[in-house]
Amino acid sequence: MMKCVIETASAQVFAQMSAYIAERNSRDALFPEAVREGLSHAHVEAEENGLRAPSAVVGTLLATLAAGGASGHSQGAVCVTPAAGVVGLHILRGLPEKATLTCIEPEAALQNSAKQAFKLGGYSPSRARFLTARPLDVMGRLAADSYQLIYADVSPLELTAFAERAWPLLTAGGTLVFADSLLDGTLADATRRDRDTEAARAADDYVDTLAADHGAVVTRLPLDGGLTLVTKR
């Protein structure tokens, strides 16, 4: 009984903090009005298309990672998600002015929606490039050791293959972010043996091998559906 009370209280506190952060972001002088307009458009588009989009908390984390991972060797960041309008605006807010965001998504309509969001956000077309293709088909075309941030919202069945292709693309200090990789905590349920859960567990084990074999720093965060961050040192 006491455990349930504590868990409920913790959930309420987290919800309050998340609401406060979202409210602060909505009136932050450092958060340009144009970006807020672009985000509003992108969120509406994501909702209408039934897409998952990161919370305000995760969005500010992405902006911080984009800013903190900047280096002279970086070409920018990579965004692999149907909700590229939301994710991309947060990342662009943190990227250096001359850095480029590469968006990969097979559906042209979703790419066009992201382009409109970036335009409303005040970013020139030169700040983003769009590859209309399956991510695993084109990751090999990207330059190695060139990206400070790679964000991936992909099927659990593709997590390991994506990590294998994304890891060489990161610069030193760069981070790979897997959205919803912990499947809302179902990885901890030993009775779950469906394909998605097993694939997500395999990917979770794989990122630990990156830590063991390559010195990666792996961080798991209970945000949204569960984030996994893999940083190259």
Question: Where is each model-derived feature located?
Answer:
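A short alpha-helical cap/connector motif
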Residues: 1-149, 156-171, 175, 181-233
